[in-house]
């Protein structure tokens, strides 16, 4: 048997407890865990490279920095199996990128070990990525894996891959429709449009839509500070979409500074004209009745509102997840205990990520508290939307 996901992406870190199904899988083959060897992709043994084939082995060994790629190998009386996992630092999931096995029994035994290790690490979920033409093995269905909502074909990493997830302990929640930003700078537009779509305004269609990118760029043009979307301009753009729809969606802007934002790298005229644009956005916000709440907003206040059903469009610092400091916009849409689910428009496809990494992305509240702060001195930008 060759149970396989495409040798493409990856993602990881975590919080939660293992499900009963996972426990039974681990208990039924306690010796399997003892026989599993964990190593880096650079250490692939010759016999596994031969079993995978040259092209597939090269995919296992591609550079996935900084997303913690690991290879797990099992040799047992029931057969041999190996899997590649990966995951973003400081998150609460592990992604199964590819699984090879010469028997169902070996594949199931290794999967049981991965589930147990994921739960022990504190993950909220173990994700599994599969090619569109591959089915989830029956034993994975029995263990509790369920399908992730199909994405809209958009950024690199949204095509050719299906996603499945096992929530340790279970987590019932609505999934947002995933759309990956198609430029380096449209994260704010995509985050806002994703949130509004979930509330019924459908800036993105329910099905693949060849006009989606045009709407992404149009929304960005209405909000941009060239090229980033700063909180005031983004709030104005969101307000205008809501107003045009005559819907009952509420918007609330929290930005705990009155100084210009996201201009840390600009000087001279490059900074001056962007400051002027932000002043125009501020005036437009006032003319529309958008109040800027400048009181500091705690992470507890954010997560409590998300837990109650609101969506939070968050300005974050990406460094904890990507080992590089960059401002970014994401949507927080569900909370369970001390874990928050994010919808992240960004996919680092060149390092093996796909939409499976960025959709329903669990992080701890403590890590989110660090991320929802950008600049020096730091400021916190949050736009709440809800019906």
State where each predicted segment sits.
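Short amphipathic alpha-helix that is part of the acyltransferase structural core
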Residues: 1-13, 27-61
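Acyl-donor binding region in acyl/amide transferases
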Residues: 91-144
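Noncatalytic regulatory segments and standalone regulatory/sensor domains
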Residues: 118, 122-123, 128, 133-139, ...
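Conserved donor-binding loop and adjoining core beta-sheet/short helix segment
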Residues: 63-112
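Conserved catalytic-core motifs of GNAT/GCN5-like acyltransferases
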Residues: 146-160
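Active-site nucleophile-adjacent alpha helix/oxyanion-hole segment immediately C-terminal to the catalytic cysteine
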Residues: 167-228, 233-242
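Active-site acidic/histidine clusters and adjacent loop/turn architecture
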Residues: 258
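Active-site-adjacent substructure of cysteine-protease-like catalytic cores
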Residues: 270-341
